Amino acid sequence: MKFKRHIYLLIIFVSTTIAQDYDVSECIKIALDRKGTLVSAGLDVESANQGLLGSYSGLLPSLNVSTASGKTKYPDQEIIIPDLVNLEIDTVSSGESSYMSAGLSINQTIYNGGKSLNTVKQAKVNLEIAKLRERNTKTQVIQNVTSSYYGLLKAQQLLEVALKNLSLSEKQVNLVQKQFELGAVRKTDLLKANVSMGQAKVELLNRKTSLENSRRQLFNDMGMIDFGQSIQAKNSEWIPVSVPSSAEALGLLKEKNPNVLIQRAAIEIGNIQFKIAKGMRSPSAFASIDYSASGDNSEQLKESLKDDWRLGVSMAINFPIFSGNSLSTAQQQAKLSKRKYENDYLTFLNDLRVQVELIRKSIMNYSEIIPINQDVVSAAEEDLKLVQKRYSIGSATILEVLDAQVSLIRSNSTLINTVHDARIQEMRLKALLGMLDIEYQTKEEEIK
């Protein structure tokens, strides 16, 4: 037992000390295997599938088998039965009687205004909605993991910037200290350098905290238990993506977005409910067949089933003449619900269309901004090197050095934040166009 415990602690220790590199696809696959919300969504699909199977009961006949037996006891009594033919008198004594019966009945709905058929159609639409909601859940999991992953990558990169900034500040303090001791610079230069180094230390502590929080968030979104284990997001170069045109985006939005398809399915539900309400005014026809037999005991019952059985066939037709205002009210309510679903669909589609257009424009904007930011970083790096050389020979002030250092930090941070925002917007566009979850479909899901 102690050996197993030591092995377990060793595994935790190794996992916490050795950072594991993951790309975003690996993190998403782990989340799709572990996240409990996907299990719940799958159960909803299975429940809807069972509802579809149950809806066929309205179209199929019902078969019932019944059997009964009974025995009645009462005080002994003699019954005198005169035989007028033979001029004799018979007596019968009895104190109990028994009864046994068996029957088979088949009932079938012939017509009920299309209610049974429409109930099946409604169950099919409900199953489709459950599958679309499962897609929604999967998309949300992928979005959360992607956002957390790039949040971790951003925190890693900003931590690297903070480390470089602190290193530059320490070197600057050492340089100013030597020059101050030689009398080449004033004490205010040394104080300014120390202030800059102190600010760099504070920034580094904040970045470490942000990195730890991002790590925890990613583990939670991946559905993993956080034991303090390290994880490293792989740094990859940002590559501009192709942005669909407005017409292409609208087409994908209508055909692929799960929420849009759910709204469209709701309209179909409204149509079916209206047909059901309308069919309630139609006559209903039912038919049944009954086969039965009875006897005083099991032997007589067997004989009756062979020779003395009874067969009954019946058919009933119901005409709904008047039922208050219930039928007309139900029909009007179904009609209003149908109009509401149609209005909700158009409103929802227009809202998403605007969102897609805004994201399209922002991604196109990022594709122009990021190269400019990259050039700015390169220029800031070169500027800092030149100012440091000038300061070392006394042709630049400490303020110029600090300004160049701050400019480099800001340009690096701006580039990191801009690339992060661009990746998040690209992910959001894929999600809105219904393409995000399709990228991570399993072979079984593709077959379905």
Where are the regions a protein language model picked out?
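A glycine-/polar-enriched beta->alpha junction
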Residues: 29-39, 46-61, 96, 103-122, ...
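Amphipathic alpha-helical coiled-coil segments
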Residues: 40-55, 137, 141-160, 171, ...
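Small/polar, glycine/serine/threonine/aspartate-rich low-complexity segments that form flexible
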Residues: 66-105, 234-243, 275, 288-319, ...
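Acidic, low-complexity, intrinsically disordered peripheral segments
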Residues: 64, 73, 414-448
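Sec-dependent N-terminal signal peptides
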Residues: 4-15
